Amino acid sequence: MVNTRRDCYDLFRRMPEGTLHLSALMCGEHRSRVIARIKEHLAAKEPLRVVSTQVVEAGVDIDFPVVFRALAGLDSIVQAAGRCNREGRLNAAGRLGDVQVFVPPKPAPRGMLLKAKDTTRALMATGDLDPEDPQKLRRYFKHFYSRLNDTGRTFMEML
């Protein structure tokens, strides 16, 4: 999962044949067909590669054994992790799902995406970031919302 539709499309074009593309740029009917194909592959336990935007983070019932997620806000990373071993099928084999967070080659666009990513990165630097701990999630949101109105300039510089 990547942060922007452009990144999704660019990455998809670099992937091997057979990779599926899923983003909000697609019309609803096309997205539904791709989601159906994904579910067919997963049900048949066939290898599958999907390049997606956050469109699958919420409201899409898909269960992947492995998820790669571009660095983003902690809330987005947690949502992406919710697509991994969602149904607990790997538990019978004594395995958990595998969620890998990577730093994309292009920076996040300015605005909320960048502030969310920067907040996650700042908390990661403290070594005190646990997405399963509700206290840590509260800490993330406190830091994130405190950054929303921060323009990076002082009041005197804006005069």
Language model: regions and residue ranges:
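Conserved two-lobed SF2 helicase motor
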Residues: 42-57, 69
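Alpha-helix/helix-capping structural signal
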Residues: 3-6, 54
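Conserved ATPase-coupling elements of RecA-like P-loop NTPase cores
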Residues: 60-64
